[in-house]
UniProtKB/Swiss-Prot annotation:
Impact noted for substituting D29A: Abrogated hydrolase activity
Keywords: Cytoplasm, Glycosidase, Hydrolase
EC number: 3.2.2.3, 3.2.2.7, 3.2.2.2, 3.2.2.-
Protein name in UniProt: Uridine nucleosidase 1
Gene3D superfamilies assigned to the protein according to its UniProt record, in alphabetical order: Ribonucleoside hydrolase-like (3.90.245.10)
Pfam families, alphabetized: IU_nuc_hydro
Tissues showing expression: Expressed ubiquitously in leaves, flowers, stems, pollen cells, root tip meristem and root vasculature.
Function (record text): Involved in purine and pyrimidine breakdown rather than in pyrimidine salvage, especially in response to dark stress. Together with URH2, required for efficient inosine and xanthosine hydrolytic activities. Unable to use cytidine as a substrate. Can use uridine, inosine, adenosine as well as the cytokinin derivative isopentenyladenine-riboside as substrates. Also hydrolyzes xanthosine with high efficiency.
The UniProt record lists the keyword Hydrolase: yes
SUPFAM superfamilies per the UniProt record, alphabetical: Nucleoside hydrolase
Major location category of this protein: cytoplasm
Organism phylogeny: Eukaryota, Viridiplantae, Streptophyta, Embryophyta, Tracheophyta
Family designation: Belongs to the IUNH family.
Amino acid sequence: MDCGMENCNGGISNGDVLGKHEKLIIDTDPGIDDSMAILMAFQTPELEILGLTTVFGNVSTQDATRNALLLCEIAGFPDVPVAEGSSEPLKGGIPRVADFVHGKNGLGDVSLPPPSRKKSEKSAAEFLDEKVEEYPGEVTILALGPLTNLALAIKRDSSFASKVKKIVILGGAFFSLGNVNPAAEANIYGDPEAADVVFTSGADITVVGINITTQLKLSDDDLLELGNCKGKHSKLISDMCKFYRDWHVKSDGVYGVYLHDPVSFVAVVRPDLFTYKKGVVRVETQGICVGHTLMDQGLKRWNGSNPWVGYSPISVAWTVDVEGVLEYVKAKLMKP
């Protein structure tokens, strides 16, 4: 297996590395940084957003659905369907909800009116399966929360992994500290069983871990500039980020905000701004390291079978053009 470094370059150095009307579904738990990524996506004319699917994580699934509906309306795309997903992990139990990071409403406790329209009658897994069946080989999924909905879609349709074009995932901490505990990143920790199902499904997967996303932040000066500019959504995002920024100061000593979800969105539209390594990734589902993502880089020939053998490798973001990604994100967030 060749697990060397690769640069996924779409051949375009400026702008979005996409054809017209690239089909995208965003699986999300909005969430302040999710909101940034979603609004950026709606401001990318090369994308045809087929829908949003919702999951627990930054908020409960019900609140994620409300926020997704609101964001579609704020972006000016009220007819984009929002399909509600699972309210609990694959194995059941109480979901982990990080409202202490994103505020009780998930949007930094900024007061917004309720959405004017309702969610889809389809579940998230049904919606994902139907769209991938309708457009085989054409649909990219950007997964910004726990991977429960994708795992359920795979379990519903065994051909899902072969029909989806690509899955780009925010998740994992590769050879670095987690952000829930020393071992695990929040999205994977939220449903480790689901993550392992997805990572071993055989789908074309790119995963962007927090070892990448924590290299990029909006500083206090950037946030001030965002709030004062004439961007279409910049004032709203700036207001949301006040709560988010205060949590970063208390939790990490960071005077600003990390750009986890926006960076993962950039991996969809500008993959050339990252380098990748390929390898099989498994997720620990028990013990003190539950949620830990461990990659076999193919550096050693094992003498016997092990839990990594026999699965397809995925692409793990390895390095990032920090300046290039920041420039792209700020341009999108400040776009009139």
